[in-house]
Structures are given as structure tokens and as C-alpha cells.
Amino acid sequence: MSVRYEQAGVNLEAGYEAVSRMKRHVARTMRPEVMTGLGSFGAMIDLGSMNMKHPILVSGTDGVGTKLKLAFALDQHDTIGIDCVAMCVNDCLVHGAEPLYFLDYIATGKAEPAKLERIVAGVAEGCVQAGCALVGGETAEMPGMYPDGEYDIAGFAVGVVEKEDLLDGSTIQDGDVVLGLASSGVHSNGFSLVRHIVEAQGLHYTDEIAMLDTTLGNALLLPTRIYAEAAKAAISTGKVQGMAHITGGGFYENVPRMLPGGLGITFDASSWPSLPVFDWLEQVGNISKQEMFNVFNMGIGYMITVRAEDVELVEAALERVGETAHRIGKVESRPGIRISGVDQ
């Protein structure tokens, strides 16, 4: 033990204990392509063992934003890692990639082994859901950088897809149908607005909310869905033209990212069930419907675009993995995102 280092605020023994606690969770995530164990300077992946003709790597990086503030307030850290994995992996999925591996970065003012284990257990659970290996990460203890009990988390995901199967939305055309997959709730975006509403109303995250049938904190901390199994099922049909992950910026910012120039989509907001958490935020926060769709996912976390004649085939593939797809929109030969009942 370095006494002077500990006097400076860094407890090496706590860091070692945290890593030791993490190992059993990391072990759950391993894939046969992984060549190194936890603790190696760099993680190595054997792409050759996948026998692909022309593999394309697809990467994504993200964090969880101010949703962390809720985890701090409620001392609930078990699912925030799932959020981190979801935010990165879902972005890779839209290009047709199979998630391969994930790395995390956790920064805190003081290493607390039990808390760090809970966070990484969530990361590992997210990796299991996504089918990717947690091959490494960094836990940085930085005295003076964060308030007591707080931390930040970010992640980095890499997936792989055959070049000929790469999805970039370029084949989407007028008349295509957009299928929407349900979100679990707010996911990991818009929490600065959520927190503003809660604080302005003088509410607490432990308050029971009748409309939500649970506490406010429980409803808001539901982890972001990981759409790996659904995306794989849809892609297996060979009929997917493009996909989108609905994150910060809601419908208006994320949907255009999958569309070729000159095309737009008209959505029917009545074509999927409304989630109580969004109804509550809209009412209590006095937020316009248009702004809600510009900030939140509004109950749709992932979109899949297919030809009209292929809708039933893709729906059936999704149903086989327990996923219900909603026919929520149609591609049109005029730019822009339009939502019936919202845009006037």
C-alpha cells in the first residue's frame, strides 16, 4: 500500500478489491473470439475465427447523462450499466452489426468496491443481453473531481457485419413501412428536463405516483432496452432496409439519420400504446406534444424500415423472439418528419 498516495486520496487497495469483485461478472460475458483475459494491457479479438468474407467493424460510444443523478439520489446502481451498454450497442445494431465487445469507463472521486461491483454487474448484464463480451475498462479514482458518492460512466462498443449486409438506409424508398419497437420508458435521454420537472413540482423520486403505479424513481430508472435479439431476428429475413435508434432529440433528430436525401416519414401517433411515464411528464411539466417528440422516445425505442410487401414476414420474425412490432409510419417522397396529431 502507498501511504502517501492514500493520503492524497487514492486508495489502491480499494481499487484492487473492486477489480476482484468485478471478475465474476465479466466472466458471464465472454465470447470465443476473445483472446485475452481481464487485466491484459489491451483486449484482443480474433476476427479470423468468425470466417467472414469482408468484415466491417461498427463502433459506438456513449454515456448515460444525468440519469445518473437519479441513481445517486436513490442509491440504486444495479441497472445504470445496462443503460450504458444499451446506448452504445443499439447504435451499432442499426447498421446490421452483431455486437462483439464492450469496454467501460467509470470515474469517481473515491473508489467504493461494493458500489463499483454493482455498476459493473449492470454492465455485464447489458453485455449478456447484447451478446457481446466485456473485454476491459478503466476505473479512475480522481480525488476532488466528483462530489462524494458520485461518478460518471461511459462505454464503447464494437460490432461486426459482412460488407454486403451493411445497413445504411440507402435502399429506403417511397412507400416503405416503418415498424416501431416499444421502449421500456424514458431510456437514457431527456433527464435534464425530467429532473427540472420533478424539482419544479417539489416532488421526490421516492413518491408514489398513481398514474405510474409505482414510485417516480422506479418508473424513471427502468433500464434502456437492448434490441440485439430483435434486430437479429429482423435482419435474418433479409428484408430490412434501414433502422434507427431513438435517443436524444426524439423522432425529429434521429429518424432523418437513417433516410436518404429527399425522403421523409409521416407517423401516426395513435398507432402504438402511449406509456404512462410520458403522459405524466407531459401533463405535470406542461410540455407541448411536439416538444415531447423532440426530446423523448415517446414509447418507441427502435425503428425498422421494410418494403410494404415484407411487413408481415418481418413482423412474424420479430414475434418469434417475443417482440411486438407496431406499424407506425410510412416513407414519403418529401423530406421531413411529420407526426399526425402533433404537427399542425
From Swiss-Prot:
* Pathway(s) this gene product operates in, as recorded in its UniProt entry: Purine metabolism; IMP biosynthesis via de novo pathway; 5-amino-1-(5-phospho-D-ribosyl)imidazole from N(2)-formyl-N(1)-(5-phospho-D-ribosyl)glycinamide: step 2/2
EC numbers, comma separated: 6.3.3.1
- Record's subcellular location: Cytoplasm
Q: Which InterPro entries match?
A: PurM-like_C_dom, PurM-like_C_sf, PurM-like_N, PurM-like_N_sf, PurM_cligase
Cross-referenced CDD domains:
PurM
Broad class of enzyme this protein falls into: ligase
Q: GO biological process: any one?
A: 'de novo' IMP biosynthetic process
Catalytic activity reported: 2-formamido-N(1)-(5-O-phospho-beta-D-ribosyl)acetamidine + ATP = 5-amino-1-(5-phospho-beta-D-ribosyl)imidazole + ADP + phosphate + H(+)
Q: Which Pfam families match?
A: AIRS (PF00586), AIRS_C (PF02769)
Q: Matching Gene3D superfamilies, A to Z?
A: PurM-like C-terminal domain, PurM-like, N-terminal domain
What molecular function terms (GO) are annotated for this protein?
A: ATP binding; phosphoribosylamine-glycine ligase activity; phosphoribosylformylglycinamidine cyclo-ligase activity
Keyword set, alphabetical order: ATP-binding, Cytoplasm, Ligase, Nucleotide-binding, Purine biosynthesis
Family as reported in the entry's similarity comment: Belongs to the AIR synthase family.
UniProt name for this protein:
Phosphoribosylformylglycinamidine cyclo-ligase
The organism's lineage is:
Bacteria, Bacillati, Bacillota, Bacilli, Bacillales
